[in-house]
Amino acid sequence: MATPQFSCLLPAFFLLVVFLFLLIKELRRYKSPKTTQKLPPGPPMLPIIGNLHQMASSLPHQNLKKLADKYGPLMHLKLGEISAVAVSSPRLAKEVLQTRGLAFADRPQSVVAKLMLHNCLGVTFSRYGDYWRQLRQIFAMELLSSKSVQSFSTIMEDELFAMVKSIESEAGRPIILADKLISYLYATLSRATLGRVCKGKETLIEVTGETLALSGAQSLEDIFPSVKIFAYLNPLRPKVRKLFNRIDGVLEDIINQQEKKLLSARVDNDQLQPEENDMLSVLLKLRNGKDSKVQVTNNDIKAIIFELFLAGTVGSSTTVEWAMSEMMKNPKVMEKAQHEVREVLKGKKRICQSDIQKLSYLKLVVKETLRLHPPAPLLFPRECRGQCEVDGYTIPAKAMVMVNCWALGRDPEHWIEADKFEPERFKNSSIDFIGNHFEYIPFGAGRRICPGISFGATNVELLLAALLYHFDWELAGGMHPKDLDMLELFGPGCTRKNPLSVIPSICIPSHDDN
């Protein structure tokens, strides 16, 4: 007779023990004297899981909007052991992000972020303080300033030309537009970040994609932090460790390559040649500079480079795909945008970064796209640094704060026909997307506003200008514009559920000479 196999019972046994532990905690909490805290209103909670079932929706930003319509624009939720607050009005978004910005300047740190970014180094997930302020200064003054973005114009134009040639080679056949956009963005980001020639780029891009696929995953370890056994049972940990080991080794090799290249190519009193003035070179100069006010380590550099790749592709590609989708569905907008681009750029064979400033209607299209389809509908969550009060309600310390900028951009109190795609609504309007108008904050606002707005917006405008200038477009399969679905898929960004499949036809061929 075979020996009985009891090992298969171990997971069930552990889950039973954990369930009983959480149940006892819940009963103790229920029986303990009620606190005098006045929490924001919110939907009823289930034992142990709280409101997790309501956040398990495939489109949590839409679900939170429906709940806010019932419970109010400042709403309390319980996600396992984590207190969470959802903000769904411009007035309260301003209160949280600006008026009391310091109280909400931290970020929650997930298991994935801790493991992939050297315990949350870098500017995105690090705690608010001196370290974060120093890194923010590096981004603002060195890496992603308007001057720095302008210096990448040749790179952007070269890679844009390559993308146009690639689309031309498939003219008359259906293409998945997002594939072309992501290829352009990875190529541009690689050169701007690491330089023209660098071994390991392909692995970096591959791991970036795999990490993005995991980045939105919430583990039991994140939502029940007091249950330490979840750290051992978490199936994400081995996957993420494997990814981290790959990316850490690749980035270490890339740094070593760059150091050797800079040592051998240094001329004219340590001035870098134009092709070597990439972001990694800037970071290495800061690391090596004895007089530098901001000191960085190799681990800081690796975290910064990796988060640039994580953040620099999804948002821009998603925005362009949504803009093209909206224009395909609204042919009059497409016609008007194409007419402007072709009139302004008449006779040109290649598009330059400097041309974009003349395309006023295209900029309205981008603004309207970001209103309806912000790259991160719930922004990156904030964390309350200490118990405080907002609008007469207590916000607990360590509460996760989610600002629903998708709901803000569709608030009928601030937008006429809020669900309609109408770029003209921004004509003669002072509203911008740099965090000054809280009914419209697709990139966030306050201290932790996205530092890459200039880089991202420039790429979006260049891509749209090229697509509209060089090509005419029709939907694949003979689909009528009114039948194009606009379903969303929530993930690292809020993308189309069904990728946009279109057929390009060449209108104005590209040419090597400008």
From Swiss-Prot:
Name the top EC class. oxidoreductase
Q: Does the keyword Zinc apply?
A: no
Which pathway does the UniProt entry assign to this protein?
Answer: Alkaloid biosynthesis
Membrane-topology annotation of the record: Single-pass membrane protein
* Cofactors named for this entry: heme
Q: Which domain of life is it from?
A: Eukaryota
Keywords in alphabetical order, please. Answer: Alkaloid metabolism, Glycoprotein, Heme, Iron, Membrane, Metal-binding, Monooxygenase, Oxidoreductase, Transmembrane, Transmembrane helix
Q: Where are the transmembrane segments?
A: 4-24
Residues engaged in binding heme = C450
- What is its subcellular localisation? Membrane
State the GO CC annotations: membrane
List the catalytic activities from the record.
tetrahydroalstonine + A + reduced [NADPH--hemoprotein reductase] + O2 = alstonine + AH2 + oxidized [NADPH--hemoprotein reductase] + 2 H2O + H(+)
The record's EC number reads 1.14.19.-
**Which residues pair up as cystines?**
none
GO BP field: indole alkaloid biosynthetic process
Q: Which residues are glycosylated?
A: N428
Keyword Transmembrane listed? The answer is: yes
Q: Which family does it belong to?
A: Belongs to the cytochrome P450 family.
Q: What does this protein do?
A: A cytochrome P450 monooxygenase involved in the biosynthesis of pentacyclic alkaloids natural products such as alstonine, putative antipsychotic compounds. Catalyzes the conversion of tetrahydroalstonine to alstonine. No oxidative activity towards ajmalicine.
* Name this polypeptide is given: Alstonine synthase
